[in-house]
Curated annotation (Swiss-Prot):
Family: Belongs to the UPP synthase family.
Biological function: Catalyzes the condensation of isopentenyl diphosphate (IPP) with allylic pyrophosphates generating different type of terpenoids.
Binding site for Mg(2+): D28, E215
Subunit composition and interactions: Homodimer.
Protein name per UniProt: Isoprenyl transferase
Organism whose genome encodes this protein: Zymomonas mobilis subsp. mobilis (strain ATCC 31821 / ZM4 / CP4)
One of the record's GO cellular component terms: cytosol
Length: 248
C-alpha cells in the first residue's frame, strides 16, 4: 500500500521488463464523480466507460499483456434495479459500438464470472465479441462480470469434489496447481498488479486467490478521471517495488 500517486509527469520506462504482464483494476468512484458534479449516477458510469477505452488503449501501447477489469460484481445485483438496468444498457451499447474496433486493434476479449445470468441478448453479444477476437494477441482484455472471488472458489471446490467422487482425482494429490487449473483465470498469466481507484483500500471479493502475491496499489483518483498518465504512474510504482514472494 502506498500514498496516493502524484500528478507529476511520468518518465519513460527503462525496459519492457518493468511492465507488469497482468494488471487488474477495481474501477471505483463513478457514483462519487457524478455526485460531486450534481449529475445522475449514470453520467458517472458513462464517463467511466470512456476511461475504460482510454485505459485499454494505453495498456496495449505500454505492452501490458492482460488487463482485467472488475466491471460488475456478483454483489452489484443488490443495487437499485434502475441502476443495474442502466449499467447493462451501457455495456450493451459499448459492445455494439466497440466490438469491431477491438477486433481491428488486435485485442482479445475474455469474460470471467457467471455472465450467463445477464440478459440473453447481452450474453449473445459477449459471446460474439469473444468469438471474433479469439485469435488476437496484442492485448487480452478480461471483463469480470457477475464475478465474485468467493463464488469462484466455491465453484472450484465443487469441481474438485466431483473429480474425486468420480475417481478422476486422488485427494492426496490436490495441490495449488490443481486449484489454479480450475480457476476462471487458468489460461492467463499470474496477476502482477491490482489497482483500486477512489481511495478505498480493500479488494471487495476480487481475484482473492490470484492476488496472493500481486502488488496492491490504492489511489485516490476516481475511475472516470483515470487515464493513460495514471496507468503509467501506476506501472512506474510497480517497477520500483521488489517482489519477494514470501522470501527475503
Amino acid at each position: 500500500m502506498i500514498a496516493p500517486l502524484a500528478n507529476s509527469a511520468v518518465k519513460p520506462h527503462k525496459s519492457a521488463s518493468f511492465v507488469p504482464r497482468h494488471v487488474a483494476i477495481i474501477m471505483d468512484g463513478n457514483g462519487r464523480w457524478a455526485s460531486a458534479r450534481h449529475l445522475p449516477r449514470i453520467a458517472g458510469h458513462k464517463k467511466g466507460a470512456d476511461a475504460v477505452k482510454t485505459t485499454v488503449r494505453a495498456a496495449a501501447e505500454m505492452g501490458i499483456e492482460v488487463l482485467t477489469l472488475y466491471a460488475f460484481s456478483s454483489e452489484n445485483w443488490r443495487r437499485p434495479a434502475s441502476e443495474v438496468a442502466d449499467l447493462m444498457g451501457l455495456l450493451r451499447l459499448c459492445l455494439r459500438q466497440e466490438m469491431h474496433n477491438i477486433k481491428e486493434r488486435g485485442i482479445c476479449l475474455k469474460v470471467i464470472g457467471d455472465y450467463t445470468r445477464l440478459d440473453q441478448d447481452l450474453v449473445a453479444l459477449l459471446n460474439q465479441a469473444i468469438e471474433i477476437t479469439a485469435n488476437n494477441t496484442r492485448l487480452t482484455l478480461v471483463f469480470a462480470l457477475n464475478y465474485g472471488a468467493q463464488d469462484e472458489l466455491v465453484h472450484v471446490t465443487k469441481r474438485i469434489a466431483e473429480k474425486a467422487k468420480e475417481g478422476q482425482l486422488d485427494p492426496e494429490n490436490i495441490d495449488v496447481g490443481t486449484i489454479e487449473s480450475l480457476l476462471y483465470t487458468h489460461d492467463l498469466p499470474p496477476l502482477d498488479l491490482v489497482i483500486r481507484t477512489s481511495g478505498e483500500k480493500r479488494l471487495s471479493n476480487f481475484l482473492l486467490w490470484q492476488a496472493a502475491y500481486a502488488e496492491l496499489l490504492f489511489i485516490d483518483t476516481l475511475w472516470p478521471d483515470f487515464g493513460s498518465e495514471t496507468l503509467k504512474a501506476a506501472v512506474e510504482e510497480y517497477a520500483r517495488r521488489e517482489r519477494r514472494y514470501g522470501g527475503l
